[in-house]
Amino acid sequence: MKNIGWMLRQRATVSPRLQAYVEPSTDVRMTYAQMNALANRCADVLTALGIAKGDRVALLMPNSVEFCCLFYGAAKLGAVAVPINTRLAAPEVSFILSDSGSKVVIYGAPSAPVIDAIRAQADPPGTVTDWIGADSLAERLRSAAADEPAVECGGDDNLFIMYTSGTTGHPKGVVHTHESVHSAASSWASTIDVRYRDRLLLPLPMFHVAALTTVIFSAMRGVTLISMPQFDATKVWSLIVEERVCIGGAVPAILNFMRQVPEFAELDAPDFRYFITGGAPMPEALIKIYAAKNIEVVQGYALTESCGGGTLLLSEDALRKAGSAGRATMFTDVAVRGDDGVIREHGEGEVVIKSDILLKEYWNRPEATRDAFDNGWFRTGDIGEIDDEGYLYIKDRLKDMIISGGENVYPAEIESVIIGVPGVSEVAVIGLPDEKWGEIAAAIVVADQNEVSEQQIVEYCGTRLARYKLPKKVIFAEAIPRNPTGKILKTVLREQYSATVPK
């Protein structure tokens, strides 16, 4: 039976002296043998708190070796980790604790004010029996035993519950099992060029699925994880050189920041091979900037529900297929579902995925779980197109698509054009009701109005987009509302600006 905690134990047996986790900012350096021992002590602490198989343990912590080992320790007990975004406000965290039925909450020092606010509520989460801060955890770990837990668990047993962003209401808890996480890590490790003793930089938060899966596949492949809890573009290149980093994880926005610092111009990092990125297509110009430094870029498309797996655009195709999310990873099928409900290998439609990497269910939401699947295919809610070579191009979210005069208009396509207008710093395109067309595309733009006007934006789009795709309305705003994970709240924008459209 596959158990993620057991995998760490096996790596500690095979490679006991190999560095597992390095955090230069705190001078933490831990081998796989040491990390496994710490995971066992974490399991002992959890057992003393009454945690048993199936119980939920909430982790409200920044990246740290303790986060990793609490996750592994819970896995060894058959308990279920609930990683929580440290940027969430008290009411949002409180909802997750209540919805997940978490029994123990372990939190870092920066989250203490949020925890205090939750505990001061008139009706705090009733299932929580213990609130463990960083100091209390450290004290308990000092006296904990490092023996391997003797618990039979793994396979289809729940491993973690991770809550989606919730742009349209309360977030849903995505349940992954030991099996789905093992499959996702295997899929990544079998698709990309990752080698034993590689050193991988992780500046992304572990409460997100891609980073958490990276932690796990690092143990699977015998990789050293270089952690950067607080991303700093001015320090990252020196860290890459000093720690002989081979691979880095980042989103396109971070990569754009990194190339603007002075250190990038003088960069000499012979060990570094490539970045893995996702969340948005990498601009072709940025790919070329990194290629000039002999740094390749691997891009991916994934969801929390697919445990960070889905498609990958390997570096050899980065320019030839610029704008694509790549092809399906190993052990994964990706297709499109047409309006007629037929699943097709090529063409345009809703992106669907079939694989062992998929979620088991949405926590306590059987109807949402049923609606998410079509004969084993997970419906992503994204609109995409798969070309004749099997490369996926994401068009937009299904729920955000605008139907104007009978034509499908994809906001993401318009946004990708408007962001190229000099002076524009942010943009969100939404559909607003229109008596003539049914809906029109409206662009909410954050820009310096001394540099750019509505007419300039429309004219710029007119040379790059079909006429029916042009924004019929441009609204300048000081800011665009986002949720704590940075996703634009288009429901808020639609509510805010619908009243401005003449009837």
Curated annotation (Swiss-Prot):
Its EC number is 6.2.1.3. Changing residue 382 to A: Strong reduction of the fatty acyl-CoA ligase activity. No significant change in the total expression level, however the cytoplasmic expression is reduced. Changing residue 211 to G: Slight increase of the fatty acyl-CoA ligase activity. Reduced rate of proteolytic degradation. The record marks 214, 302 as: Important for substrate selectivity. The record marks 9, 17, 195, 197, 244 as: Membrane interaction. Induction: Expression is controlled by VirS. Induced at acidic pH and in macrophages. Belongs to the ATP-dependent AMP-binding enzyme family. Required for maintaining the appropriate mycolic acid composition and permeability of the envelope on its exposure to acidic pH. Catalyzes the activation of long-chain fatty acids as acyl-coenzyme A (acyl-CoA), which are then transferred to the multifunctional polyketide synthase (PKS) type III for further chain extension. It has preference for the fatty acid with long chain length in the following order: hexacosanoic acid (C26), tetracosanoic acid (C24) and palmitic acid (C16). This is Long-chain-fatty-acid--CoA ligase FadD13. It comes from Mycobacterium tuberculosis (strain ATCC 25618 / H37Rv).
